[in-house]
Amino acid sequence: MEQEICVIGFSGGQDSTTLAVWAKKRFKKVCLVGFDYAQKHSVELECAQKIASLLQLPYEIIPLDFLENITHSALFKNSNDLMGHSHAQNKDLPNSFVPNRNAIFITLLHSYAQKLGASNIALGVSQADFSGYPDCKEDFIKSIEHALNLGSNTAIKIVTPLMFLSKAQEFQMAKDLGVLDLIIKETHTCYQGERKILHAYGYGCDKCPACQLRKKGFEEFQAML
C-alpha cells in the first residue's frame, strides 16, 4: 500500500465506485469528491453518499449548479432535449456532453488535493468504452495534468486505471475486487435517474445511452464467464 493520499472524482457510478475500491487497497487515505451540477440524474449523489458510507470513505459534494447557466447539455435538469441527438454547440458530440465539465472537475480536484497534501488524483474515465466525450481521453488527461501542475508548481499525478478497460472488463475487475454485487445494486449510471427497476446489470431506464453502454458491457462480461 502506498503511503499517500488519493482524491477521487466520485459520482456513485460503476466507474468511480470500482475505482474507489481499487484505490482503497492501494493508498493510505482516500477522499471522495462529488459534484452537483444540476444534473437530471442527481439521484447519483444519494447513491454516492450511501456507497461512501458502505466503503467507510469521506465524501464531499461541491455545488456547481451554475454550469447550466453557461452551457448546453441534455443532462441538465431544466433541459427538454431528448438523449441520443447531436450537441447544440458541436454536432460532432452527443447532446449529453457537458462542455468543459471534466476540466472544471479536475481543476477543483487538483485544488482540493493541494489542500489535503494529496499526491494523487484518481479518475474513472475510459476511452476504450466511452460515450464519445473527448474529455475522457488519455491525451486530454495528460494535458490538463501538465497544465495544472505548471500553474500551481506541483507534481500531483492523475491516475486513470480504467482508461483502457471496456465496461465488460470493469465488471470483471469489480468481481475480482469482490464488489460485483455492490456495483450492480448500489451504483447509478442512468441519465434519466431511474431507480425503480433493477436489471441484471443494475438500475436504470434501459434506454438512455448510459444504460445501453452498461447493459452491453454486462452482457459481454457474462459471455466471458
Swiss-Prot record:
Binds 1 zinc ion per subunit. Gene3D superfamilies: HUPs. It catalyses: 7-carboxy-7-deazaguanine + NH4(+) + ATP = 7-cyano-7-deazaguanine + ADP + phosphate + H2O + H(+). Keywords: ATP-binding, Ligase, Metal-binding, Nucleotide-binding, Queuosine biosynthesis, Zinc. GO terms for biological process: queuosine biosynthetic process. It is an enzyme of class 6 (ligase). One of its GO terms (molecular function) is ligase activity, forming carbon-nitrogen bonds. Pathway: Purine metabolism; 7-cyano-7-deazaguanine biosynthesis. Its cofactor is Zn(2+). It comes from the Bacteria. Its EC number is 6.3.4.20. Zn(2+) binds at residues 190, 205, 208, 211. ATP binds at residues 10-20. The keyword Ligase applies. HAMAP family: QueC. Belongs to the QueC family. Catalyzes the ATP-dependent conversion of 7-carboxy-7-deazaguanine (CDG) to 7-cyano-7-deazaguanine (preQ(0)). This is 7-cyano-7-deazaguanine synthase. It comes from Helicobacter pylori (strain J99 / ATCC 700824) (Campylobacter pylori J99). The lineage of its organism: Bacteria, Pseudomonadati, Campylobacterota, Epsilonproteobacteria, Campylobacterales.
